[in-house]
Structures are given as C-alpha cells and as structure tokens.
Amino acid sequence: MGRKLLGLLMLAVLLAGCAGVPSSSAPQAIGTVERPAPSNLPKPTPGMDPEVLLREFLKATADPANRHLAARQFLTQSASNAWDDAGSALLIDHVVFVETRAAERVSATMRADILGSLSDMGVFETAEGVLPDPGPIELVKTSGGWRIDRLPNGVFLDWQQFQATYKRNTLYFADPTGKTVVPDPRYVAVPDHDQLATELVSKLIAGPRPEMAHTVRNLLAPPLRLRGPVTRADGGKSGIGRGYGGARIDLEKLSTTDPHSRQLVAAQIIWTLARADIRGPYVINADGAPLDDRFRDGWTTSDVAATDPGVADGAGAGLHALVNGSLVSLDGQHTVVVPGAFGRMGDQTGAALSRNGRQVASVVTLHRGAPDMAASLWIGDLGAEAVQSADGHSLSRPTWSLDDVVWVVVDGNNVLRAIQEPASGQPARLPVDSVAVATRFPGPITDLQLSRDSTRAAMVIGGQVILASVEQTQAGQYALTYPRRLGFGLGNSVVSLSWRTGDDIVVTRTDSSHPVSYVNLDGVNSDAPPHGVQMPVTTVVANPSTAYVAGPQGVLQYSPSADGQQGWSEVPGLTVPGAAPVLPG
C-alpha cells in the first residue's frame, strides 16, 4: 500500500509539472536529528473532535525530529508502528475531510491541493495539482480521546505550519573552477539557534541536492566529518555566532592539503554560516590543528571575499544598451556609441558583456520577422573588432559562462557553446546536449541565461521558466540535465529573464498587472511593483542591486530603496523606443 501510494503521489507531482524530489541517505537527513520540538506544535487533548485532531496532526508533521515524534502522539501504538514516514513530504493546503462517523470509530478521506514537496534533505520545490486520494484514514476512541488508528504511509504537511516551523537557509558548494560558491537552498526546522550551525555544517558534509551532484565540488565530502558540535569560538555552547562570540568548527579526516582547496573548505563553511546570520570570527580546525595557520584566531568573510556569491559581475563596466541596433555606453546622462565593431554594426537584437565586462557577444538579425530572417553571432573585445561565431535563422540573446565561453540557442532548439580554438584562434561551435529539456518541455527556447556560477541555466519555453543543471561530461562536453519548472504562478506569461543573484531570477511578462516578477530556485514567485511600467516589456537584465527592462518609453530601472519608495524610473539617456539594456552575463 505504502509504496503504491508514494508512486501515485510522485506521479501527481510530475504531472503537475514539478520534478519529484529524490530522497537521500544523508547521515543528517531531516527526521533523524535529535533536537527539542518547536514550541508551537499542537498536542492531542482528550476532548478533541476527530476532524480537529486530523488537522492538528497535519500541523504536527512539521516537526521531523525523532521520526516525527510530535505527530506520532496523535496515533495509536499500532498505527505508529506501521506508519512509514520516510522520504519526501507533500505540502498541502485547502484540506477538506469527508467523514463517516460511528460511536467509537470514524473513517475519513482527505482532499487537498498540492503546493510543493520537501525532501528528507530539506530541499523544497513548488508544485501544483490536486492530491490523489491517498486512501482512508481511520480514527478510534481511546481512553485519552480520539486517535488515528490507520493512515497512509508518507508525510502530508500542512502548508501554514510548514511556513511557521521551517526556515530557509542556503548551503554553498564550490563551482567546478574553484572561483566561486554555488547556492543550494534548504529548509530546516531547528528552533534552537545554537544548534543551527551544527545542522548546516552537517548538511554540507552530507552533500548537495541530487541535481547538483555533478555540477559542483564539495570540499567537505566524507570521510571528512565534524569532531563535535559547532561551538562558540572560545568553546562555549551558547550564543554561537552572536555578538563577538563567533563560531568554532572542528573537523577531522580532512584529506586535502593544498592551500587553495583549504580556502574553498573555509569558503563553503563561512558563506553558509554568514548567510544564516551566524557571525564570525570562524575558528576552523582540522585534525586538531588550524585549517590555515594564518587564520588560527579565526576567519572573516573578507578572508574569502574572492568567492563571494553576492558579488556583481563586471560591476565596473556599467550599464550598456542597444540603441537603434548599435551598442552604446552611458556617460552621465548621455549615451556614447562604443568604438569598434559593436558600435558600427546595425541590426543588433541581443547582446551581453562578458563576466569581467571586457568582451561582448552580440546577435545581428537581418529581415527580422520575415521568412528570410537571418541571424549571426559576433564575439570580440569591447572597443575592438569582432568575429562571426555562429549563424542561423534565429539566435537567442547570448550569455557568458564563468570561463568566458558564449552560449546561444540556434533556431529555437539547438544550444551551442561558441569558443575560440586554442591552436588556430578560429571560432568553433560545440553542441550542448539538451535532450532532457526537449523531452520534458518541448518547444522553442526563446531565452537562455546562465547563472553567475554557470552551474545552472534558466530558459523561457512556451512562456514558462525552466531551470536546468549544467553538467560537464567525462568527455568534456556539456549537457542540460534535471529540467524543472519554476514559478507556477507566472503561468505562460514570461517573455525574458535574467539572473539577479545566484538564487533569484527576474522576468518580464505579458501580464499588464504584473509586468515584472521574481522567481527563486525553489520556484516561489513574487511581483515587482507595476506602476511606471508601460506594456509591452521585453528584454530584462539585472544585478543584485538593480533590474533594467526595455519598454515602449525606453529603458527603465528598479532599485528597492531603504525608505520603501519602490518604483520604476527612466534611465537618463536611454529614453529611446526600442532601446534594450545590456549588462555582464
């Protein structure tokens, strides 16, 4: 019964358009860690009505500790013995119970909407759909009141209680090049702040979510382990990461000896803890000695600033734009046509600066919208000449990887990497395996943008946001894997997208009530204010501080301000119809 039900539920999530979250054998998986129960969880009482008891049971499943001990208080002993609570939890809302009552027994069926899933690693993903009938739930009257005597296997978690109990934290793993760290958001139910650091470091050791297993490096992988719980820098057990107390992390069985790898060990730990508001200094020891003698008294975030996941790429390059088909830069409130090929060429329809801001990739489209439309990709140094690197009937807006390679979609379905051959210096086009994307989400890819760390690709397919992992195969080729949909609330309205941070994407839409929205890696979407934006909006580019969109009146910018005055404003010099913003990325 249990395995059949689990298969049915995962099928429901897949049909709804959200990949099921694989379970994990992580040693610190949710539900196995011994910790106090959150204080806001309900408990059964003798006079509790059967329906009330069922609803309170769904709330109690929010605490995974000790194999959902809080929820098991609502079960008879035989039901508790039989209940399999392993694997992913389904997050449900708008729950309705249909009951058949007798004096000593109640049988109920449950109807609900599925809003997402939560894996035993703490990975949350949004979903949508109706919960298939999980089978009957039976209650019996005992000396202590009503108790559940039969229930389906698996965990059904009340959405409101999930939001009240779990907190989103982000783990960080090293990108394949070792230049930066990559976010892996997790949800944890740790009511005691002093236990949070231990929980997060334990999750780092357990490893990334399955879709990231082949896209990142984990310098904290086993056999490395924690020697004991994370403490204050002076060894104290309370006030960890608060005030000037700092945090002390004692590791053992660390095999890496080279300084750069040890720096990445520190970076993974420090950014994970710092982003969880667990403050340094961070005293990190390995096998009884400092991880690095230079930092025996503790590391700070400035010591790993080179890997800062929040740094804006090529910030010094500033905003550029395509105006009347040519690339321009901003000089105060005036535009200046850039020297070289990209300033001379007309009919440019999409462009991007490289991550360091020193190179340009641009698409020239002739006879746009006509049957004989032709597009070509040009790459070169900013201010210099360019080389034609790809062509087709249509080309998507280009995007740069962390290793300065340009990605583009040719004719809607063929994803290419445009490189320069080391020996000849000539351009070469290398195909990217996108079969997994095309199989799951058929249709032309109208926009593709790589994340800053280049381990993820966000795409627009059929007006939907599709996220995929970027994997490098053993043969050195690249593939887009684990595709899943983000932002069900966006419908099919998405036009263009851009990574604001490694965890947050900005999109333009055809919805005049919400012309610009955000969606994160979990799939949760929210809206930017609409006032000041005229329709239609097209190209969007963003960095951590500002989003820029192309509209009928030219380029608009949006920067949330500290005083709460949030709105869109025109970019001086770019109030030209058809102007499109360009940033590194």
UniProtKB/Swiss-Prot annotation:
Pfam (any one): Germane
Subcellular location: Cell membrane
Disulfide cross-links: none
Domain of life: Bacteria
Range of residues in the leader sequence: 1-17
UniProt region (Disordered), positions on chain: 24-46, 560-585
Positions where lipid (S-diacylglycerol cysteine) attaches: C18
Lipidation feature positions (N-palmitoyl cysteine): C18
A GO-annotated cellular component: plasma membrane
Topological category with respect to the lipid bilayer: Lipid-anchor
Alphabetically ordered keywords of this record: Cell membrane, Lipoprotein, Membrane, Palmitate, Signal
NCBIfam families per the UniProt record, alphabetical: PRK13616.1
Family: Belongs to the LpqB lipoprotein family.
Protein name: Lipoprotein LpqB
UniProt organism field: Mycobacterium paratuberculosis
